[in-house]
A protein has these predicted regions:
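Sec-dependent, cleavable N-terminal signal peptides
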Residues: 1-24
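A recurrent domain-boundary module in secreted/ectodomain proteins
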Residues: 730-747
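Small/polar residue-rich beta-strand/coil "junction" motifs that cap repeat-based extracellular fibers
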Residues: 707-711
């Protein structure tokens, strides 16, 4: 054991110097590491910053001697003086050729320092956070300036970059907030990302002729720049700027050649393409002349050149890039050459002084937002070759009066003409197949539109808010009218829906308050939610015989609607579908309907009667609530669920007629006042109805099963078949009626042929009677279904409706 301890102590003794010190020797308070015949200045401790080794004025010798050996001092090691905040000055010998990364990081007290002309590289973070440095001279020997080399040297007021520098790395001078002037020498080829970001005292930049690449946001937040000087226009036009804020012009706004500001720009003949961001923000430009050599104009090339008044694009140019002339608010005249094929996204957005536009026939695509928010634009000629009008192409061109979309156009993009307030007329070419989302929304002055037959889809909100539109004709190829397509077209009074429309989507015609009549063609299968809600002038609706679904609130608040016939194709009507149609007096329901949803007819206060067809099984909460004018209701035995408040506040119901056969399974019929009750032959049970009858007409030969909840009062008169009088007088609960009358004629409304049931044969018998006048064997009194004391063709219609509303065969 003692041997092992001794061995461990011996190893520790050998390693201990290495653990406590990273230097090889020290001379005159300077610490060194040996590398062959050379010495590198380093720090004292086992890690950088362990001790504040250096303070005051430091002088590094050319040579240093240790143990009789002389070494040439050739480099400053990594982290050598890191965070030595008390060091005020430093002299380096000409023998030093390399300065390591982080060498002077955080030396905030360092005010005077000269980089020897022997140094070839300034590495990453070398002088980072040396906030006391005021004057920096990068010697001609230096080739590269590393990443964050002078990051946040906030006291630096003067910077001289040597002519040997070819690359300035990212963040190299970021946050040098006192720097006012900058000259990039001509040997520099690349300025990397954010190299001069937040140099917010910088006013002047001179760009050398050798620069070809400027990285992303190289001059970001250099907000006090006023002047950029180029040595020559040709190399300037060839610089590849990564972003707008890579170009110092974005903030400076003024470009100089020598002492003269460039206002009338002539692009050199040697230039074939204007690069991205080349003149972005140069508001001092008033004109630009392109040579025929130029074939393309890059993205943001002249964006926000607010002084430009006139631009002529030569025929050699094929493509105008994204936002190329964005925000050129002074541009009043634009001539596009006949070689241009594509106008890029937002190319002329916010050119608010532009008044007229002629698109040459060479142009096939006007991309997204190309002329959006050109508020002064009043006249547009789109040429005859444009195939695509991109999204937002002419959005908020508030001065635009009239647009003719040529036959070449296939698609009109989303919001293409959104918010063109003064546009009164649009002619849509006969090749357009799709009208995009909000394409013409809020064109408040648009008077009308004719959708040609080639159009298949009208997308959501396409014409929403066009409140001066009085007419809309939808072509015969349109299959879908999108959600809110014509919402708030408050003047729309003349509407034609094409014969191929299959779906009318949510709120398609919502709040079209001038619309009086709608014909929904037989092609339509679905009328979606709120499609015609708040069409307050709508009096007449014809629903085609292919509609299967009417969505919720579809015709709600259509207060002028007087009657509706729901075709038998309809299987579903959503909640609130006809809510508050306060002028509706009659409605005919589909015999395919199974459910009347919650509040479907709530507030139809003029409705006089309702016949619920025999297909219905469920009547929902408030289905007919507040139908104050409702006097007569017909309920089939198919109903298995009748909501307690289905007829809430229907104070004037005086007649309840059951139809069908078998048991009443609907439960309580919640009507508070006394009513006349009619029960046909074939009903076998009326348990749980909970009705207060003023009079009951029960035509069943066998008294239907009854319970204590069938009737709440027995003071009214019970009319029964004379032949069944004794049976009712003896039947439980029926016998409780104070006055039971046996009618000599067994009156079953609709039983024309006297077989004690109502069927299609009764319709045939009634028609024959009306044609021949022969009533032999008929009970004609049973045919007066509308109680007008005469039998006419109107009773045939009533009899058919009775059959459709019941399970009777």
């Amino acid at each position: 054991m003692q041997t092992m301890i001794k061995t461990a102590l011996t190893v520790l003794a050998i390693l201990l110097p290495a653990l406590v010190s990273a230097h090889d020797f020290e001379v005159n308070g300077i610490y060194y590491n040996i590398n062959g015949n050379e010495a590198t200045v380093t720090y004292q401790g086992s890690y950088a910053g362990q001790y504040n080794e250096y303070s005051g004025a430091i002088v590094i010798p050319e040579t240093v001697t240790n143990d009789g050996i002389t070494y040439a001092v050739t480099s400053i090691g990594e982290h050598a003086f890191e965070n030595c905040s008390d060091m005020t000055s430093l002299e380096l010998p000409s023998s030093v050729t390399a300065i390591g990364s982080w060498a002077f990081y955080g030396c905030s007290g360092l005010k005077s320092f000269e980089i020897p002309n022997s140094v070839t590289t300034i590495n990453d973070y070398t002088f980072c956070r040396c906030s006391g440095l005021t004057d920096v001279v990068v010697p001609n020997s230096v080739k590269t300036i590393g990443m964050s080399a002078f990051y946040t040297c906030s006291g630096m007021t003067n910077l001289s970059i040597g002519t040997g520098v070819i690359s300035i790395d990212r963040y190299a001078f970021k946050g040098c907030s006192s720097l006012t002037n900058l000259t990039i020498p001509s040997n520099v080829h690349e300025i990397k990302e954010c190299a001069f970001e937040q140099c917010n005292s910088l006013t002047n930049v001179t760009m050398g002729s050798g620069v070809t690449i400027v990285g992303k946001d190289a001059f970001l937040d250099c907000t006090n720049l006023t002047k950029v000087t180029a040595i020559d226009l040709t190399p300037w036009c060839r610089i590849n700027f990564a972003t707008q804020k890579a170009n110092p012009l974005y903030y400076a706004h003024h470009l100089y050649l020598g002492a003269a500001e460039v206002t009338n720009l002539t692009i050199p003949a040697s230039i074939t393409s204007i690069g991205d961001y080349t003149f972005t923000g140069c508001s001092g430009l008033t004109s630009v002349s392109f040579p025929n050599s130029v074939t393309g104009i890059g993205s943001y090339a002249f964006s926000e050149c607010t002084g430009l008044t006139s631009v002529t694009i030569p025929s050699a140019v094929a493509t105008i890039g994204r936002s190329a002339f964005y925000g050129c608010t002074g541009l009043a005249s634009l001539s596009l050459g006949n070689g241009v094929t594509t106008i890029g996204s937002y190319a002329f957005q916010k050119c608010s002084s532009l008044t007229t536009l002629n698109i040459p026939n060479s142009v096939t695509a006007i991309q997204e937002g190309a002329f959006s928010r050109c508020e002064g634009l009043s006249s547009v000629n789109l040429g005859n070759s444009v195939v695509t009008l991109g999204n937002y192409a002419f959005e908020v061109c508030t001065g635009l009066k009239c647009v003719v979309i040529p036959n070449s156009v296939k698609t009109i993009g989303s919001c293409a003409f959104y918010g063109c307030d003064t546009m009164t007329d649009v002619i849509i070419g006969n090749s357009v197949t799709a009208i995009g989302y909000s394409a013409f929304a809020y064109c408040h002055s648009l008077k009308g539109v004719v959708i040609p037959d080639a159009v298949i889809t009208i997308d959501n909100s396409a014409f929403s808010g066009c409140n001066s539109m009085t007419s809309a004709k939808i072509g015969n190829s349109v299959t879908t009218i999108g959600s809110s397509a014509f919402e708030r077209c408050t003047s729309l009074s003349d509407l034609t829906i094409g014969q191929s429309v299959a779906s009318i989507r949510n709120s398609a015609f919502r709040n079209c308050e001038a619309l009086t009549s709608v014909v929904i063609p037989n092609s339509v299968t679905e009328i979606d939610n709120c499609a015609f809600i708040e069409c307050s002038a709508l009096t007449d609706v014809t629903i085609g015989n292919s509609v299967t679904n009417i969505g919720y609130s579809t015709f709600a608040e259509c207060s002028a609607l007087t009657s509706v016939a729901i075709p038998n194709s309809v299987t579903s009507i959503g909640m609130d579908a006809f809510k508050n149609c306060s002028g509706m007096t009659s409605i005919t329901l589909s015999n395919s309907l199974t459910t009347i949803e919650e509040s479907t007819f709530e507030g139809c206060s003029a409705l006089e009667s309702i016949v619920i067809p025999g297909s219905v099984t469920t009547v929902g909460y408030h289905a007919f609530a507040n139908c104050y004018g409702l006097a007569s209701i017909t309920l089939p035995t198919s109903i298995t669920s009748l909501a307690y408040y289905a007829f809430e506040s229907c104070y004037h119901i005086s007649s309840v007629t059951l139809t069908g056969e078998g048991e009443w399974r609907g439960g309580t019929i919640s009507i508070l006042r006394a009513v006349s009750v009619s029960i046909p032959n074939g009903i076998t049970s009326v348990k749980g109805m909970y009705l207060k009858p003023s009079v009951v007409y029960c035509y069943a030969m066998t008294p239907p099963a009854c319970d204590a909840n069938s009737f709440t009062d027995y003071s009214g008169t019970l009319h029964v078949p004379a032949a069944a009088l004794a049976a009712y007088q003896a039947a439980p609960y029926w016998q409780n009626f104070m006055n039971i009358v046996g009618d000599a004629v067994e009156a079953t409304p609709g039983d024309v042929n006297g077989d004690n049931k109502v069927s299609i044969s009764d319709v045939s018998a009634l028609i024959n009677y009306l044609l021949s006048g022969d009533d032999t064997g008929l009970k004609i009194a049973n045919a007066d279904l509308n109680s007008d004391s005469k039998v006419s063709i109107a009773d045939v219609s009533s009899l058919i409706n009775l059959l459709l509303s019941s399970d009777t065969e």
